[in-house]
Amino acid sequence: MGKTVTYQRPDGGSVNAYLAEPAGTAGAPAVVVIQEWWGLNDQIRGVADRFAQAGYRALVPDLYRGRSTLDAEEAHHLMTNLNFGDAAGQDIAGAVAHLKGSGSAKVGVTGFCMGGALTTLSAVHVPAMDAGVIWYGYPPLEYVDAGRIKAPLMGHWAIHDAPFPIAGVDALEAKLKAAGVKFEFFRYDAQHAFFNETQVGEKKLLPVLEYNPALAAQAWQRTVEFFGRTLR
């Protein structure tokens, strides 16, 4: 369904990305999809394909510049070497601008794990984004200037999340409330990465990950309905 495209960052640099588009829907709303710490892999391409099937243009920036991994130690290395401010303010900002410049009047941002943290930062640093859906990931809260967030947000969080403890979600929620941000958070009786269908049984890349199909379906439905309200 999708293809590789190249777009420009605000600073003029180029970024490769995976683009999935609905058939015969010119000017459809769009979503920038941000990867987990594993990189731009088949699983995140599949998420973009699902958005396309739901009627959205979906663009996945290649934040690691062609690298991806199944090894947690290497993924941690790739993530810690990523400049999050640059990724949000340049790669993701450029993705939003590219989609708006190619026919989409409204563009949302969504991301998983590391991508959830980047979605939160994008709400601060990318004023052109029209809505955001955060999946079980947040940055250090001192980097969240909630007063700058204008886009409505939705968050899907796992109560038993080891990488991103729920106490941090409570603190983020309080910060957003204090700033008057329009948002809705949902907490699920699940572990980290409960939306990732590859994290099941012996296929799990880390023991703290666990796919939950029922909760994944519920969160997906909420996401599609939210973008339907905010992007259409």
Task: Label every PLM stretch briefly.
Residues 1-232:
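N-terminal cap/leader regions of alpha/beta-hydrolase-fold enzymes
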